[in-house]
A protein has these predicted regions:
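Positively charged, low-complexity intrinsically disordered leader regions
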Residues: 1-52, 56
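Phosphate/diphosphate ligand-binding glycine-rich loop within oxidoreductases
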Residues: 34-41, 47-156
Length: 156
């Protein structure tokens, strides 16, 4: 799977739920599946449960994890195209994404709605930029309009 933005991306939901039940029954059954693989989790917004559960799930699969809090401890990133870079943002997201992709095997993105431009929010621009420019599989840890991990958990 190259992209997981919506539970519909899973295909057969019954099969996905069945696999999830199997994994939940034996959390370490696939503990070598992610060996020598790295998950990069990019947070444009704060998180508690999603961050902890996603990181733990990756660890249960034997993956390494890198957490990048874009607004704390990293350069602020400009996400708008065509903006003059004269503000407090030191790097453009389009330049940073390929760099991020070079350090990992899969990327999780958490980027909330800006609530100033409905069309922009619904376009899921940040998420789709990662899809287009990272060269890696990408999944949403919550976006402007969806939270597929939570939606999948709610199906239980």
């Amino acid at each position: 799977m190259k992209s997981f933005l919506n539970v519909k991306d899973l295909g057969d939901l019954k099969e996905a739920l069945s696999e999830a039940v199997e994994i939940k029954a034996d959390r370490y059954k696939y503990d070598t599946l992610g060996k020598n693989k790295t998950l990069l989790m990019v947070f444009f917004n704060n998180s508690l449960r999603t961050r902890l559960s996603t990181q733990k799930a990756a660890m249960n699969l034997g993956m390494n994890t890198i957490v990048l809090d874009v607004n704390a401890g990293a350069w602020k990133l400009e996400t708008e195209r065509g903006v003059i870079m004269d503000g407090d943002k030191s790097e453009h997201l389009l330049e940073a994404i390929p760099v991020m992709g070079s350090f990992c095997d899969v990327i999780g993105i958490r980027s909330f709605a800006g609530l100033t431009d409905r069309d922009y929010d619904y376009a899921e621009t940040v998420y789709h930029q990662f899809e287009q420019y990272s060269g890696k599989p990408v999944f949403a840890m919550e976006t402007a309009t969806v939270h597929p991990l939570q939606a999948f958990a709610d199906l239980f």
